[in-house]
Amino acid sequence: TLWNTITDYNRLAAFIPDMVSSRIISSPGTPKRVEQIADAGLFAFIMPDRVVLAMEEQPGQSLRFRAVSGKVASMSGEWRIVGDRAPVTLYYYAHVLPLTPLPPLVSDYFIESEVRTRFEAVGNEAERRMR
């Protein structure tokens, strides 16, 4: 299902481009923390190449996240699933504030491109799992 795809934290790197690793680093029974490492290449100054996210899950409905450490000034967002049966709609919102301020045209273009690529990868993986 879509929910299982977006919360498959330990396998996200298997289907999201440029994500080197993603793993739960918190202990069972504590608030969920996920460390993600990406290969941002030349754009590491825009997108964090390492971040630890605090996850807040509302199973089957929404997943909120915020950076608690890493190479980013601020990062937060949400995945939201609307609909109980197919077709469902997946919404994604994120606010990323890089450590290094850049011209908006540069950072906005790159972030939009990265988000689109990752969003499409999640959608493709969810569809693959439903077959």
Feature roles, as predicted:
Residues L2-T5, L12, M55, Y92, ...:
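Hydrophobic pocket/interface hotspot
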Residues F15, A44-F45, S74, P104:
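Alpha-helix N-cap/helix-start motif
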